[in-house]
Amino acid sequence: MAAPRDAEIHKDVQNYYGNVLKTSADLQTNACVTPAKGVPEYIRKSLQNVHEEVISRYYGCGLVVPEHLENCRILDLGSGSGRDCYVLSQLVGQKGHITGIDMTKVQVEVAKAYLEYHTEKFGFQTPNVTFLHGQIEMLAEAGIQKESYDIVISNCVINLVPDKQKVLREVYQVLKYGGELYFSDVYASLEVSEDIKSHKVLWGECLGGALYWKDLAVIAKKIGFCPPRLVTANIITVGNKELERVLGDCRFVSATFRLFKLPKTEPAGRCQVVYNGGIMGHEKELIFDANFTFKEGEAVEVDEETAAILRNSRFAHDFLFTPVEASLLAPQTKVIIRDPFKLAEESDKMKPRCAPEGTGGCCGKRKSC
């Protein structure tokens, strides 16, 4: 049973996203505005096929679209009006499946209302999308089976939940081994104060419940995930003086991370990997995270954990693997857990620069996430 404070937060969030907000124009901060740039062509085409009401009622940050999705089973946490679900529906194809879950009934009803429309629009024989009304901290209660998904995504939603660890534990349970949680969310530069947490507007707009970014790695390790791998990061500017006074020195960043669930096997050691190319939208270059970019046909030395992720995930057939003897190549140390605020600052210095294709997050330094 949810604690009284948790239950109150759930009620406030449902009211905010179900009744207060009618379109994205009603947001009082810029923390969850969808960016207009940085979207690759194949995703842009898929987005153009989504009904305009579904898009207008969607409040996520950026586009959360990982790579290599053909035939995958994907779960979208906090699917809202279903925008991302309908984009992904086209990318996984008729043999894949998308499940969206959201605790705001009004949003789920919007998503369901256009199920037949999108099935026909995409040229599918039967729908490959299912929408569920439920809480993302209680996936089993919603009927979601253990080890049944290749990928779980979330778009600016986990911050709205009081118990982040409970959400990530549920995600770990429903992922197959080799699967990943690929998600965009808002993170704080320090522990968020009680004044910020208790502010209903700041919570509803993705700031009040933001996790201190270093805590993500602690929670992930406790549950069993590999260390978080940062993909993109962009500074959030609020643009509301009254709310900025409440926030004080606390800064916020939107960041896309990927967390992998790997089988408990002995590490195989460092490897040289060669990307075979051919992944849709990433035929010549795969930007895997902030540390590793793989170009078609080019050998890259990777640490044992990165090698294990590539070997055990849906990317296994996209790479050639060659073991590296310690005596032949000196280890190249990379900091796996990157600071999203530093990456955002580095990215800002390199303007003009957009988020890597298909990776989610936002484009450049914006008044949004």
Curated annotation (Swiss-Prot):
<dbReference type="GO" id="GO:0018872">
    <property type="term" value="P:arsonoacetate metabolic process"/>
</dbReference>
<dbReference type="InterPro" id="IPR029063">
    <property type="entry name" value="SAM-dependent_MTases_sf"/>
</dbReference>
<keyword id="KW-0597">Phosphoprotein</keyword>
<feature type="modified residue" description="Phosphoserine">
    <location>
        <position position="46"/>
    </location>
</feature>
<dbReference type="Pfam" id="PF13847">
    <property type="entry name" value="Methyltransf_31"/>
</dbReference>
<keyword id="KW-0949">S-adenosyl-L-methionine</keyword>
<dbReference type="GO" id="GO:0030791">
    <property type="term" value="F:arsenite methyltransferase activity"/>
</dbReference>
<dbReference type="GO" id="GO:0008276">
    <property type="term" value="F:protein methyltransferase activity"/>
</dbReference>
<protein>
    <recommendedName>
        <fullName>Arsenite methyltransferase</fullName>
        <ecNumber>2.1.1.137</ecNumber>
    </recommendedName>
</protein>
<dbReference type="GO" id="GO:0009404">
    <property type="term" value="P:toxin metabolic process"/>
</dbReference>
<comment type="similarity">
    <text>Belongs to the methyltransferase superfamily. Arsenite methyltransferase family.</text>
</comment>
<dbReference type="InterPro" id="IPR026669">
    <property type="entry name" value="Arsenite_MeTrfase-like"/>
</dbReference>
<dbReference type="GO" id="GO:0046685">
    <property type="term" value="P:response to arsenic-containing substance"/>
</dbReference>
<dbReference type="InterPro" id="IPR025714">
    <property type="entry name" value="Methyltranfer_dom"/>
</dbReference>
<keyword id="KW-0808">Transferase</keyword>
<dbReference type="GO" id="GO:0032259">
    <property type="term" value="P:methylation"/>
</dbReference>
<comment type="function">
    <text>Catalyzes the transfer of a methyl group from AdoMet to trivalent arsenicals producing methylated and dimethylated arsenicals. It methylates arsenite to form methylarsonate, Me-AsO(3)H(2), which is reduced by methylarsonate reductase to methylarsonite, Me-As(OH)2. Methylarsonite is also a substrate and it is converted into the much less toxic compound dimethylarsinate (cacodylate), Me(2)As(O)-OH.</text>
</comment>
<keyword id="KW-0489">Methyltransferase</keyword>
<keyword id="KW-0963">Cytoplasm</keyword>
<dbReference type="GO" id="GO:0005829">
    <property type="term" value="C:cytosol"/>
</dbReference>
<dbReference type="GO" id="GO:0008757">
    <property type="term" value="F:S-adenosylmethionine-dependent methyltransferase activity"/>
</dbReference>
